Amino acid sequence: MGIISTILGVIGFGFGTTIGIVIGYYLFIYFQSTDVEDPEIKPLVELDSETIATMFPEIPMWVKNPDFDRIDWLNKLIGHMWPYMDKAICKMAKSIAKPIIAEQIPNYKIDSVEFEMLTLGSLPPSFQGMKVYATDDKEIIMELSVKWAGNPNIIVVAKAFGLKATVQVIDLQVYATPRITLKPLVPSFPCFANIFVSLMDKPQVDFGLKLLGADVMAIPGLYRFVQEIIKDQVANMYLWPKTLNVQIMDPSKAMKKPVGLLSVKVIKAIKLKKKDLLGGSDPYVKLTLSGDKVPGKKTVVKHSNLNPEWNEEFDLVVKEPESQELQLIVYDWEQVGKHDKIGMNVIQLKDLTPEEPKLMTLELLKSMEPKEPVSEKSRGQLVVEVEYKPFKDDDIPENIDDPNAVEKAPEGTPSTGGLLVVIVHEAEDLEGKYHTNPSVRLLFRGEERKTKRVKKNREPRWDEDFQFPLDEPPINDKLHVEVISSSSRLIHPKETLGYVVINLGDVVSNRRINDKYHLIDSKNGRIQIELQWRNSS
């Protein structure tokens, strides 16, 4: 009887429990407490200040800040690409972490550390808004608001002394506002040399951590402690103005930084060809480096002389010694009309031995075309001395990667002086009365320089630089900048689109100024000029 009673008691308990669960389930579904109400949905403008303050952290940046733009298109793009980005990012993370782990584990007597599982989950990050800053420098600055409530699964297995331990990271949430700067902008794909990343605020990080299957973050006080440690460590490394620098390409090669100086001494010419009707010539020599935007340099004119002697020295900045060549052209000066070319020749810089002067006597040719027939009559000879002086490592600025860095003046500049560099970048909103084919004319201490002409353009870009070696700083000098439009028409062939006069005293004290100047005598025209003062020491 005792056994039968026990069996009946167990059956009754099981039956009663089952009936109770079923009845409770239906009561929970079909009956609702009277104090439970549906949430009330209101427009944001109707909410009181206290409610808005509570919701404020969740409001997107483009709502709180008018200068932030919505970038839903980017979120859609990343949403479609996320399954592939997840695999690519995890693969790259493993390849980066593997050698670092292999280098560190011997110090802790650990046999191995491996990823048993590494996935970022199915939920992509969300960009709440983006702000782009406009600057006059060659850079792009962006600020992003990033939120990521992901479902990653990262399992790391460590083995030591025959034991195995697993660490699992789950339910990762990150909120950060990074500033991304792309600079300097260069004319080679992807069109920027470096990526600089800074955090504008301390990031908010939340995650779950399991050790041997147990939730470590459930330990009282540990959760808050770990959060603060992570915030402080990340802030110490990347909180603005500190940056993470990722180099995409060598900026010195992309921007073709100067690597040396070519010293040329034009000594004399011998038995030049007669160009004038009276049996003479008025020769001068023009020197240029191939692939250089800087205008060529010229000797003085020697009137009525077929065997002129100049003994003039010139310094040319070299950027690509393996491919550049020095072009020497002898012209016959004419008071009216185009100057006649007497002859020319070139010197390949790769054929020169650095730091070794070389005296050369060049035969003047009609042109450097290989199919050009040899002239029956000699055009004369040109005697020059050339020396290539590569810059030493000490002469290269430490911050050469910085596009705003100012170099020193070339060797040979007077100790009390330096080099004034004027870079004409661009102009905007130019208005010509008859035509708009702008070029820029610079006038400094009686010396005139000009940029190339841009046809039919109200927003021209030149990016041409001009150098003025000076014996003393231009503290009290002024630079006259004039924008001119020229045309081949007989009527109104030239007109001024505006001008500006720049005091150079600030350039000497600041070493670099890059600004946009409003043009005088122009309604809305502006021109961007960059000025650099490079001391000789």
Swiss-Prot record:
Major localisation: Golgi
Cofactor(s) this protein requires: Ca(2+)
Domain C2: 240-362, 402-517
Keyword Transmembrane: yes
Keywords assigned: Calcium, Golgi apparatus, Lipid transport, Lipid-binding, Membrane, Metal-binding, Repeat, Transmembrane, Transmembrane helix, Transport
Pfam families: C2, SMP_LBD
SMP-LTD domain sequence ranges: 67-249
Role played: May play an important role in regulating an unconventional protein trafficking from the cytosol to the extracellular matrix.
Topology class, membrane: Single-pass membrane protein
Name of the coding gene: SYT2
A GO term for molecular function: lipid binding
Protein location: Golgi apparatus membrane
Protein family: Belongs to the synaptotagmin family.
CDD domains, per database record: C2 (cd00030), SMP_SYT (cd21677)
Residues reported to bind Ca(2+): D276, D282, D332, E334
GO term, biological process aspect, one: lipid transport
Transmembrane segments: 3-23
Ranges in the topological domain labelled Lumenal: 24-537
Descriptive protein name: Synaptotagmin-2
Chain positions covered by the region annotation Phospholipid binding: 227-505
Gene Ontology, cellular component aspect: Golgi apparatus; Golgi membrane
Cytoplasmic side: 1-2
